[in-house]
Amino acid sequence: MALVATAIGIYDQSATTTITLSRSDVFDGATPKAAIVTAVSGNPHAYNTSSDRLAYGYGAVVSRNGGRAMGCGIVANDGVNSGASREVTSDSNPITIPNTGGTNIEALMSGQLVADGITFTKTGSWRSTSNTVAIHVVLLGGDDFDAWIPSSLITSQSVQKSIPFLPNAATYFGTGSNTGGVAFKDDSGLC
């Protein structure tokens, strides 16, 4: 099984940043690819080991594995106990993730599965211009994707890094003004 986490940090001082994934990035025909897409704002992005959640973020689970949603409980808008994840099984079951008031959220970001793919849009201003937005993608099984989000969709101010997925371990990187951080556990620890 190939498991790779790709994190893309976008350093953008403007009011709006949009990244779109095409439908073919998310689906293989009518079958959702095994992937977890999580949109996170804030810098750095810390892993909250006490609650098995990704702190300071919220996002969308866009696939299933073995009949159950992958990543349940991985998303929290306050890093403690307010999950905002939802299972998405088809284009007719879209998802919108709002900012529900977590104190550590610097900007509002939403992810929605639509007919032509997923669009993430950051709106509003940063608490400080040194903060970043990161899009995290974890692929479970299948091919080993190093850069799942096409680099052509990323601005010249961005940085992109790929790190191995470490089973049963939190992985973290990125503390600078334009770097992203990511932390995941293996799927057995998510639900």
Roles of regions detected by a PLM:
Residues 1-191:
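Surface-exposed molecular-recognition determinants
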